Structures are given as C-alpha cells and as structure tokens.
C-alpha cells in the first residue's frame, strides 16, 4: 500500500484552517513529566514539507507509544485533533484519535526533506490545495485506506465533527468577551482559558468538613458532552454560589477553572483530569443542546466483578432479580439512622450480585416488575464474596434508554428468567426470596481451586455428615457477652480471661466442631462454630458441656445420632499457613435442612445444561 503525506497540512492547521484526517509522519516522541498524573507524550511530526513539535498525544492514546506502535518514522492518519492556544500565544495540537497506516520498519526513514515550521511566519505549501478546494461534504473514511498513486487525504472538514447538531462554537462570558467552546476530551492542565458546553449528569449534596486546618464545604458534579465526561468540584464560596444555580440534567456553558489530575479512588468518571471551580469560573445556562448525551456508562460484567479489586469504582447493569425490604441502621460515625435496601442484580453472564442502596434511593426503589438497573460509580466490596455499594456520588437509572438495557431485557424475558443464577455475593443473615448462592459440588469447589487466591471464596453445597470429631469440640470461654476468648482455670474457683483482663466465677461453653461432609463426588473437612455446631448436634453447648461431665455415654449418643444427616452448607474457604504448612481451611457460615424442591430444580437444570453440551 502506497501512502502519501498530506503536504502543507501542518501550516494549514497552525493557521486555523480546517484539515480533514491529515496523513503525517512521526519523527520523534518524547515523554513529559507530569508529577503524579499519567505521562504525556510530545510528538514531532512531519507532513513532508514541514515538521512541528507542538503535537501532544491525548492520554488515552498513550498505549500506542508504550507498546511501540507509534514510533519514529511510522506514518499515521490523524482522525481527530484539537488546537489549543497557550497564554504566550503558541498553539498546541492535541491528537485525540489516530490510526497507524505504516509501521516504522515498513517506512525505514524520514519521508522527503521537511524543514521546521516557524509559527511566526507563513510557510509555502507548494503542493497543498487551499481550504476552499475542499469538497463541501467530504467522504467519510472507513479505515481501509487505498491511496496508491493518488493524492493523500487533505483537509478539509472540521477536525471535530459531531454527527448531530452541535452547540454554538462560542459563547459570551459574563465579562462580555467571546470564548470558544471546546470538547471535554481536549481539556488539560496546560490550558488557562476554555469553555465547555456540557450536561450535568450527577449532582452531589453540599458536604462540610472540619479538621486542624479549618473547615469548609464542597459539592461535586459530573459533566458530559459528545467527546467525554469530567468531574467538577466547587468549594466554599463557589459552592454557595453555584449549588442553587446548577440543576441535574440541565446543560450549561462552563468557563475557566483549575484542571488537575483526577483522584480515581473517588470517582468512576473516565477522565484523567478534574475541574475545580475558582473565582473566575462562570456558569451560563444553554437552552439549545438537546444533542448532548445524558449519563455515560462503561459497564463491567457481573462475572468480572469476582476479579475486580476491592474498593474499585465500576459501572454495572443488570436485571433486578429480587430485592429486600428497607431496613434502618445507625451509622456509628454520625450516630445517624439511615435507610438501607439490598437489590440482587443478574446479567447475561448468569451471575448475580447484591447491590446496596442507601437513603432516599433505598426508600423510593421499586423492583416489583424486575426492571433493568444501571448503576454508575458503585464501589466494589469484598464482604462475603463480592458485592456493590451505591455511593452518594453514584447514579442509579431504572430502565435506561440504551442498547445494553434493551438487549438485557430481551434476553431476560426470553431465557434469562428461567436460568439458575449463581451469586457472587454472600448475604449474611439469610438471603432474599429467589436468590441462589454459588452452588457447587465438593469436587467443583476443589477443581476450581476456590480459596487459593488472595481472597476467601464462598460457595454452597449439599453434603452428608460422615464423621464428627468430638475430641476438643468445645471449650470454656469468657462469659462476657461480646467475648468468646478461652479462659484459664485458676484452680481457685475463678476463671481468667486474658483479653478482658478479668477474672470470673463462671464461664460459658463455646463449640468448635470439626466434621467431614461428603457428596457423590468428594469429601471435605469443615469447621462448624457455635450456631452451626448446635444445629448439627441438636443440642445447646451448655447442655452438652454438662452432659459430658455427667453422662459420657449419653454424650457419645448425641454424636452418633448426628452422623449421616444431610444438610445445605454455606462454606467459606481460604488458604491458610500454619507452621510453614499451607492448607485450605473450610468454615461453615450456615447450616440448614435441605430444601429438596429447590435442590431438585437445580439438579434438573444441571442435567439439561449437560445434555445440551453433549
């Protein structure tokens, strides 16, 4: 494939002309230090006539350099770029999107004899047509460029096209000056004067803080336009000024503000930077911007959450398989009562996750018709497997108008509602109606190496008790309500608890029963603590402690009668190391009678799946 450079394109760009997908050659790339932020790359490029070092790579294109796809002498087509003016009048060209047409080894060196472009004087463009020579409606490029023996694509449509009608290209600021509107994607800390036209997709409440350095207030918003999204925060006087002015889902012109590297720990917004309002910031309503999108999502599959790090901020979409009633809890930090509701979401991966709604979101939620729920900015928790918490900065959309939602609804109505879904969340204290846990056979749990990662794993199984180890199955514990530490018999009628640093005239019995459970394929040693052990043995720890002292034979019979009973077990497995020896420790979190109706349904569903595989 023969490719020609867009001769004269650099001069046209720097003189403010519209250039359509110019073909340029990379002469050199250089990393620029940005402190704690992602690296920025400055690119020296050539159009065959001139070279220019004022090209900057947008951070989303960094992998092209880091993977050595964009290197010295390669030829690329610039699909989208933004020209920014600096305080000193110099121009910087931000490369937003490009395709590498020829790699460096295919080219072998510099094309032509280009000379540096001098921004202070116009350059001759001997072979470049003028902007007026461009067609009014340039053909869309499909990426399959075939230009052998023909002129390379030159100019001549706006470098920043939008398929829908766009907002005005400039706006008057409160000071009366005209300010050019730029896309969110072009914002960077090197700019001092800018205006964006964006929709407010999330607005938080005003929050206050107080510490040794003083006190203050703030609120944050999330903004979106056709090029991307960004988070903005107003502090103190700016918070008082802008909070009553800015409304959710409305469109505004935002002019001036400080741009800094975004703290990704607190936001899922896909932007390397965030805005802080300052004394020069202005916010002007825009009445003609119906083309702007609403909330932007970057959905993660529910099955992928199992491998997502704790505290990550993610976007998810799922069918509300079931939901729980609202409960009230008291937040320790503020001693304030808040509402809480768990909803259980599933997607086409067949996995189910528990998401917790808080406050007003929990109160007003209605999942009775199994709606599609999209959550932007949920935090991943590892409490009992994987679960999600909806934050004050999160956005919850019920039945969103999006292709993902339509696809999910169609899948659920046609087949998804009949599937047996496996939960990646372990909901303590029982589960909501219709919610199934992560059912496994003991063989599956071992073959899938559950518990051998950095985090504990959870699964449920149906197992039969085939052995109980009655030796050391109970111990004398501290009688305090919140302490289960083993006490030391002082041999004087008193029992000492090292944890509480007190002596007591009595103690309580606590159980730690080791049992072997088996199914048709494998077996597993499982540790059962107080409630689980008492359920299996059918007696309380207090009764068993007294029985052991008074009637050893009756004590033995309790264990014999507990053998060969079948239960549903909810099990936590984790690799633990003791005395330099590593082994899987399995702990029963819950033990209950088998629900044979549900168990039969699971077996039938499993048989059908295996039959289809065969």
UniProtKB/Swiss-Prot annotation:
One of its GO terms (molecular function) is zinc ion binding. Keywords: DNA replication, DNA-binding, Metal-binding, Nucleus, Zinc, Zinc-finger. Residues 112-178 are annotated as: Disordered. The keyword Methyltransferase does not apply. Transmembrane segments: none annotated. Coiled coil: none annotated. One of its GO terms (biological process) is protein localization to chromosome. This is Replication protein A 70 kDa DNA-binding subunit. It comes from Gallus gallus.
């Amino acid at each position: 494939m023969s490719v020609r450079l867009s001769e004269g394109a650099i001069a046209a760009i720097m003189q403010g002309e519209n250039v359509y997908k110019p073909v340029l050659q990379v002469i050199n790339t250089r990393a620029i230090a940005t402190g704690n932020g992602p690296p920025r790359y400055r690119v020296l490029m050539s159009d065959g006539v001139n070279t220019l070092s004022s090209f900057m790579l947008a951070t989303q294109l960094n992998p092209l350099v880091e993977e050595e796809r964009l290197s010295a002498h390669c030829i690329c087509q610039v699909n989208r770029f933004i020209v920014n003016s600096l305080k000193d009048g110099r121009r910087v060209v931000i490369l937003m999107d490009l395709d590498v047409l020829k790699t460096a080894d295919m080219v072998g060196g510099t094309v032509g004899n280009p000379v540096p472009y001098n921004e202070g004087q116009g350059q001759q463009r001997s072979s470049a047509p003028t902007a007026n020579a461009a067609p009014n409606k340039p053909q869309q490029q499909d990426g399959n460029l075939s230009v052998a023996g023909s002129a390379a694509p030159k100019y001549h449509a706006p470098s920043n096209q939008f398929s829908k009608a766009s907002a005005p290209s400039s706006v008057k600021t409160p000071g009366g000056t005209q300010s050019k509107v730029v896309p969110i994607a072009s914002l960077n800390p090197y700019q001092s004067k800018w205006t964006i036209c964006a929709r407010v997709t999330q607005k938080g409440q005003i929050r206050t803080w107080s510490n040794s350095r003083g006190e203050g207030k703030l609120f944050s918003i999330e903004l979106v336009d056709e090029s991307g999204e960004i988070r903005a925060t107003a502090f103190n006087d700016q918070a008082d000024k802008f909070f009553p002015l800015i409304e959710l889902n409305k469109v505004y012109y935002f002019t001036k503000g400080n741009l800094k590297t975004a703290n990704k720990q607190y936001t899922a917004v896909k932007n390397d930077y965030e805005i802080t309002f300052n004394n020069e910031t202005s916010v002007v309503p825009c009445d003609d911007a119906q083309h702007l999108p609403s909330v932007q999502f970057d959905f993660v599959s529910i099955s992928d959450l199992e491998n997502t790090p704790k505290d990550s901020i993610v976007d998810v979409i799922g069918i509300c398989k079931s939901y729980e009633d609202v409960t009230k809890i008291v937040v320790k930090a503020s001693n304030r009562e808040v509402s809480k509701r768990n909803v259980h979401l599933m997607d086409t991966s067949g996995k189910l996750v528990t998401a917790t709604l808080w406050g007003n979101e929990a109160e007003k939620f209605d999942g009775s018709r199994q709606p599609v729920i999209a959550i932007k900015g949920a935090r991943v928790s590892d409490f009992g497997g994987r679960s999600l918490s909806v934050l004050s900065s999160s956005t919850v959309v019920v039945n969103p108008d999006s292709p993902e939602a339509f696809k999910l609804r169609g899948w659920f109505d046609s087949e998804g509602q009949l599937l047996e879904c496996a939960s990646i969340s372990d909901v303590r204290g029982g589960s909501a109606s219709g919610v199934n846990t992560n059912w496994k056979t003991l063989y599956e749990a071992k073959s899938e190496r559950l518990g051998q990662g950095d985090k504990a794993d959870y699964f449920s199984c149906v197992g039969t008790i085939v052995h109980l180890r009655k030796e050391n199955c109970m111990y004398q514990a501290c009688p305090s309500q919140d302490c289960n530490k083993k006490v030391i018999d002082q041999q004087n009628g008193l029992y000492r608890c090292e944890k509480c640093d007190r002596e007591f005239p009595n103690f309580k019995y606590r159980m730690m029963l080791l049992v072997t459970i088996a199914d048709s394929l494998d077996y597993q040693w499982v540790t059962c603590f107080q409630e689980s052990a008492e359920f299996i043995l059918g007696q309380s720890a207090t009764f068993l402690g007294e029985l052991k002292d008074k009637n050893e034979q009756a004590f033995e019979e309790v264990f014999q009668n507990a053998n060969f009973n079948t239960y549903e077990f909810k099990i936590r497995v984790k690799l633990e190391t003791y005395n330099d020896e590593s082994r899987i420790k399995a702990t029963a979190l819950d033990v209950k009678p088998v629900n044979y109706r549900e168990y039969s349904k699971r077996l039938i569903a499993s048989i059908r799946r295996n039959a289809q595989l065969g």
